[in-house]
Every structure is written in C-alpha cells, then in structure tokens.
Amino acid sequence: MEFEGRFIDIMEVFNVDKYEFNIKLEQIKKLAAKKEYKQAAEIAKQMNWNKVKDWSTLATIINVQEAAGDYEEARDMAILAYNRNLGGRKLIYKLTEFFIKVDDFENAEELYREYAKLSAHDVNKYILYYDLRRAQDAPDTELVDILENYKDTYP
C-alpha cells in the first residue's frame, strides 16, 4: 500500500511538471507571436527539452532562439532534433547554417555533404555551399564558380 501511494505522488509531480512545461511553452509562443524573441528565448533556456519529441515544438524553439540571435542555443536545439531524426532536409539545412554562423566549418561541411546528397535537385544546395565557402573566406573566383554552377543548373 505504501508503495502505491508513493507511485501516485510521483505521478502527481510528473503531471505538475508537464503542466508547468505546457504553460511556459504557451508563454514562449505568445511572446514569439509578438516578436519578443529575447524574452521567449530566456524562458526556453530555463526549460528541459530532452524529453520533447515533437518536431513542431522543437522547430518553434529553434526559430525563437535564432531570432533572438542566440545561435549556439539554436544550434544545440537543432542538434537535439537531428539526433532524434526529426525535421528532415530543412533541419539539416538550418543546422548547417548554425554551424556556419558559429564558425564550426568542419561540422558545417559534413552536414552540407549530407544535405547535398538528400537534395540533389534542390537549388538551395548551391546557396548553402556559397554561404559556407564565403564564411571560410574562399577566393572570389571560387564563389563565382559556385554561382555559375547555380545559374547553369537553374537557368
């Protein structure tokens, strides 16, 4: 009997935590709708996202953190989603952008190659590659070549 009571107490705590989590998530969404991204990002930083498996929720938080200019937090959330196989090509593209923004070119190149494989006929692979090479201070001639390849492929 005592064990049963402890189980109920634990479940009540879990439900309260879930309830509080949902309240904070709604706060974040309302702040984001009002374009108050910094405040929304601060609330998001205080929350534990490790159990969240919903792509839509994680995408919202990634977008909030990006809009607030916190690329490291946005990158970390995107990695969390990536490791759960959420988001598909769009997430890989976004994660590559975050790695570029935080000057992690090794990971950016690896993800770019993955994106290019998945997106063989997608115009965005040229744009992403251009952004990557430009951030790496590639010579102008190489950047022009990338743009010409883009133009030749998508006239």
Where are these predicted regions, by residue range?
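Structural motif corresponding to the intra-repeat A-B loop/turn of tetratricopeptide repeats
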Residues: 34, 68, 102, 136-140
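Residue at a conserved register position within TPR or TPR-like alpha-solenoid repeats
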Residues: 31, 65, 99, 133-135
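Short coil turns that delineate tetratricopeptide repeat
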Residues: 18, 52, 86, 120-121, ...
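Alpha-helical segment of the N-proximal tetratricopeptide repeat
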Residues: 20-50, 60
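Alpha-helical repeat scaffolds
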Residues: 3-12, 39-47, 71-82, 105-117, ...
